[in-house]
């Protein structure tokens, strides 16, 4: 995995964490982690459509302050993850199942190896939909 940036927003400092580009098929998905030494477990925070990791700094800080590890990703076509549209300001995927496939790859080949258990899902909007889809899959790692 290659290092990836975490940017400071006008009103929100980036909580101390780490970010990487995770390769999935022909794309690179930005993933980030905070407080991986936690003994309480990991909250997998998943954003809604058109959102990005930096938008959730306040929520991430709240979870870290309560002793949890946090893991998050920018969906394909969002934030600093790869885009398939020629116009790099447009978030687009070929089909919705691409998001499911990406999440399955990241969960099973990165998050579950790097993050402390137990695992808790927390999703907003599209992120909640994709977490639910993952919950009912046969590869579900959540407690």
Residue locations for each model-derived region?
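An N-terminal hydrophobic leader/cap segment in hydrolases
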Residues: 1-23, 29-36, 121
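Donor nucleotide-sugar binding loop of glycosyltransferases
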Residues: 27, 52
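Active-site glycine-rich loops that stabilize anionic/oxyanionic intermediates
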Residues: 40, 46-51
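Short coil/turn segments at beta-strand junctions that form active-site/ligand-binding loops
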Residues: 40-41, 67-68, 117-118
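Conserved alpha/beta-hydrolase
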Residues: 53, 60-86
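Alpha/beta-hydrolase active-site loop
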Residues: 91-111
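Alpha/beta-hydrolase fold nucleophile elbow
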Residues: 114-125
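Short glycine-enriched nucleophile-adjacent loop
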Residues: 128-139
